[in-house]
């Protein structure tokens, strides 16, 4: 599995700010969007471009243009919504698919409860958004669903991940790509990432 941990100073600085315990909801949202934008910049590095001729201010000009790559952005509800605006800054014409998966707090097993996928998703590259890759179960369930629908070109964008979750994802879906800001230390006995960010969904939406 292709794993890209982005160590750029801007990424690491913004991630560090997100780890502050008493960060405001507003600031957490802003940083989540900013980091997602930076992750998208790297994750789209392999998009094909073509040369086209346009009419410029002083005649015809050759320019580079992305070559018809169809993308669907797939935020995992609900925390993935906090990453969506940052991603769409770079791919504003991407179609949006929604997948809802929650993790049972006792068994830690993923439970899908909703999905709405774009048509002809088999022709698109899916960019799955989930800020926290902990046990990997939620992302694995999402990729299972996408592949069942015929989509096999899948990139996952996460802010932080635990080694255990990465290993589980790689075992089940070695053909996906993972882009993230940090591979953290471990999971605790409750399945939370250490040091992690806390509950990203609660911090994005201001709930407890």
From Swiss-Prot:
- What cofactor is needed? Mg(2+)
Task: Give a yes or no for keyword Transferase in this entry.
Answer: yes
Known regulation of its activity is: Allosterically activated by GTP.
Gene3D superfamilies reported for this sequence: 3.40.50.2020
Q: Which residues form a coiled coil?
A: none
Function comment: Catalyzes the conversion of uracil and 5-phospho-alpha-D-ribose 1-diphosphate (PRPP) to UMP and diphosphate.
The family database entries (NCBIfam families) matched by this protein are listed as: PRK00129.1, upp
Record-given protein name? Uracil phosphoribosyltransferase
Q: Species name for this entry?
A: Blochmanniella floridana
Classification lineage:
Bacteria, Pseudomonadati, Pseudomonadota, Gammaproteobacteria, Enterobacterales
